[in-house]
Amino acid sequence: MSDRGILSSLRYLFADFIGEDDDEPPFLPEGLPAPVMTLASEAIHLLIDYQGPGYARIYVDRLRRFVGKQGVDEAMLADIARLMAVRMSYEDPIRIAQLKLAELADRPGAAGSADVRKFSLDELIGALPAVIAEYIMDALDWLGWTRRMRVSIRFSTKSRIGIRRLKIEAGLRRWRLLSVRYAKERVWVERWLHMIDRSLTKQPQAAPAIIHTATMIVGYGDVYRQGMADWNAIIDGLAKPTFDGVLPLSDLAGAVAEARDAALPDPRQSALKRKIAEIRARATAGAYATAPSS
């Protein structure tokens, strides 16, 4: 994570703890094309609602890195702006409570509704501050309960008690940036941006494919874990070694698309791992065949 990103996170955290995250929304980066300005403006409003102005400022700081950068056209910048906003507003129990309350506010006088979502214990604990969550996770890991046990949570606006509980759950956003889940998401976003940056330097034609790998990670639960695992497998098995110069892969974009097509909802990732190994072997054999003989 860059020094600027760390400072932005710390500045937001300290302001939030003392109740002073009432800053004005951050300004859009200079030099944004008009269509991207619209996307970024919507993202800022989304992230202010999600977490606060300080958090939206982190988004702006991250987006600014790619404004005017060589090789980044309007379409690519728009995709970065859109997909980064989606990932920075990741779905957790706090967000579900926020959206449920927003649904109630948007439909005054309408009958309430209830949604039931199932979470694993590690997901629920992951929304807590890390200093608390780590002790609980260690105990539950020892018991083998963290992923095996599912908990059904009811998000309801049908009663005053349900609404009150939603407000309490939504109010936990104050601690979100100290949570285990946020730490993982922050690392992921920074690594995704880093891989985009490396692609622009090492293999510019693959940059759009790297940008769009963000769509692999969605939601929560098993779908989220599978997407994250598949993303890491593709980046670690294909993109990073190509950028490092240890894998002679001339068409990284095609390889990423091929690997994504092979990804199945399989925790063992058998098909994906076979495909990545096949692509690596093919690239190595091709480079060997075209190498000049001594």
Task: Give the residues covered by each predicted segment.
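Active-site loops and adjacent core secondary-structure elements that bind or stabilize anionic groups
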Residues: M1-S294
